[in-house]
Amino acid sequence: MSAQNPVLTPEKRGEDVDSALRPQTLDDFTGQAEARANLKIFIEAAKNRGEALDHVLFVGPPGLGKTTLAQIMAKELGVNFRSTSGPVIAKAGDLAALLTNLEERDVLFIDEIHRLSPAVEEILYPAMEDFQLDLIIGEGPAARSVKIDLSKFTLVAATTRLGLLTTPLRDRFGIPVRLSFYTVEELELIVRRGARLMGLGMTDDGAREIARRARGTPRIAGRLLRRVRDFAEVARAPAVTREIADEALTRLLVDNMGLDQLDTRYLTMIAVNFGGGPVGIETIAAGLSEPRDAIEDIIEPYMIQQGFIQRTPRGRVLTAIAWKHLGLMPPKDMEAAQFRLTLEDDD
């Protein structure tokens, strides 16, 4: 289990499922401008032709709106939306049950599609390409192959780790969409909208303070907003100001860059124990007593985006930004060493 601060994990939690705060249309959705513009065109074209939308693959860190976009797509297409995740589909029969219940042009959303088992993935290939199920009924000499026709549907899938998808599966998605971290300005709009829907007073600098510490992730911004609201209500404040937001987030151990204790431990360990790196991911995982996947999927994407670390062939290396944030002096030969590592990376 990860020791990351629960309010900063981008993974989905029960309190995050608040349909009232979710945008309902692509026009309401903030951020990801290029992806939204393209999706609008693809949806309009599919509706004009009366066809199912081509299969869509969302790629990006958790908490950026992949599930929300899938729901919006179904709504704008005027079709049913069904949702599941890779780990839930344990057997080929589970997938067959889902697919045979879909109606014409329905949207099926599979989160964490990289966690599908190979046996289930094999069933998915003909379903995506030919809208047919190829099932083996029975065992041994009595086994026979049965083909079942499916309604033409749209598979919308999401993954945080594109490299774990097999090439045959990846190639069957006609519309790949990569989502990126949000800017502070975009998150500020999301925080203001959330506060308005909650009936919560919010000053401009209060919204900006929350947005600044939300790690570029709307899900985290929403969670921080709910926690700051708790502090504001108990203090009987008429509105969330920068001072209230700062006090609340500091008490929640979220620093001014959105880092928590685990993030700081990560950076400090590389700085103090390994002289700023390079250090391998397995060594970092052992030192933090955290699973490698949690470090690669949750901690590092934001670190890289903010310029705190570099990934090199020899391991992770702290940048000058990280040393400054920690308040530590980097090694004198750091710049020369990083230049050599960059050259190796280019090779």
From Swiss-Prot:
- Gene3D superfamilies for this protein: 1.10.8.60, P-loop containing nucleotide triphosphate hydrolases, Winged helix-like DNA-binding domain superfamily/Winged helix DNA-binding domain
**Where is DNA annotated to bind?**
R292, R311, R316
Group of enzyme by EC: hydrolase
| Domain observations | Has 3 domains, the large (RuvB-L) and small ATPase (RuvB-S) domains and the C-terminal head (RuvB-H) domain. The head domain binds DNA, while the ATPase domains jointly bind ATP, ADP or are empty depending on the state of the subunit in the translocation cycle. During a single DNA translocation step the structure of each domain remains the same, but their relative positions change.
Extract one GO molecular function annotation from the record.
Answer: four-way junction DNA binding
Residues engaged in binding ATP = L21, R22, G63, K66, T67, T68, E129, D130, F131, R172, Y182, R219
Organism for this UniProt entry: Allorhizobium ampelinum (strain ATCC BAA-846 / DSM 112012 / S4)
State the oligomer form and interacting partners: Homohexamer. Forms an RuvA(8)-RuvB(12)-Holliday junction (HJ) complex. HJ DNA is sandwiched between 2 RuvA tetramers; dsDNA enters through RuvA and exits via RuvB. An RuvB hexamer assembles on each DNA strand where it exits the tetramer. Each RuvB hexamer is contacted by two RuvA subunits (via domain III) on 2 adjacent RuvB subunits; this complex drives branch migration. In the full resolvosome a probable DNA-RuvA(4)-RuvB(12)-RuvC(2) complex forms which resolves the HJ.
Identification of the protein by name? Holliday junction branch migration complex subunit RuvB
Listed SMART domains: AAA (SM00382)
What is the role of this chain? The RuvA-RuvB-RuvC complex processes Holliday junction (HJ) DNA during genetic recombination and DNA repair, while the RuvA-RuvB complex plays an important role in the rescue of blocked DNA replication forks via replication fork reversal (RFR). RuvA specifically binds to HJ cruciform DNA, conferring on it an open structure. The RuvB hexamer acts as an ATP-dependent pump, pulling dsDNA into and through the RuvAB complex. RuvB forms 2 homohexamers on either side of HJ DNA bound by 1 or 2 RuvA tetramers; 4 subunits per hexamer contact DNA at a time.
Where, if anywhere, are coiled coils annotated?
Answer: none
SUPFAM superfamilies assigned: P-loop containing nucleoside triphosphate hydrolases, Winged helix' DNA-binding domain
